Regions:
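A beta-strand edge to alpha-helix "cap/lid" segment located at domain peripheries
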Residues: 1-29, 41-120
Length: 120
């Protein structure tokens, strides 16, 4: 099984935000990693950056270890230009996420850049 075989694939860029909440709540680290391109970057709460799937895997493994519960936010309008999309979600606590997704050769979408929480 490859990462691409893990969970449902994003047919629309907006699907990625829904999938991340579902997989966080399920503790599905491999399913989370499968939402990213191999060389993607993920901003970390401490100001660092996880680069590539191995570092993203470690970051999510640490995050879900305590089994926190995540609540979906309000998906903001997606901006698409060719094979790139800018997605954003307003979180229940007032913060905002910002992500860049890229359309893959099979028509599905994966994140390239993920800023999970900007201050409110």
């Amino acid at each position: 099984m490859t990462l691409e075989d893990v969970g449902e694939r994003a047919a629309r860029p907006e699907d990625l935000s829904r999938f991340v909440v579902e997989r966080l709540n399920a503790g599905d680290v491999e399913g989370l990693v499968a939402l990213y391109e191999p060389d993607a970057v993920l901003a970390l709460p401490d100001g660092g950056v996880a680069s590539g799937r191995d570092e993203i895997r470690r970051a999510y493994a640490a995050l879900v270890a305590d089994r926190p519960v995540f609540t979906p936010g309000e998906q903001q309008p997606t901006l698409v230009s060719g094979d790139l999309a800018l997605t954003s979600v307003r979180l229940p606590g007032g913060g905002v996420t910002v992500e860049v997704a890229r359309r893959q050769q099979d028509g599905t979408w994966l994140w390239v850049i993920d800023q999970p929480a900007l201050p409110a």
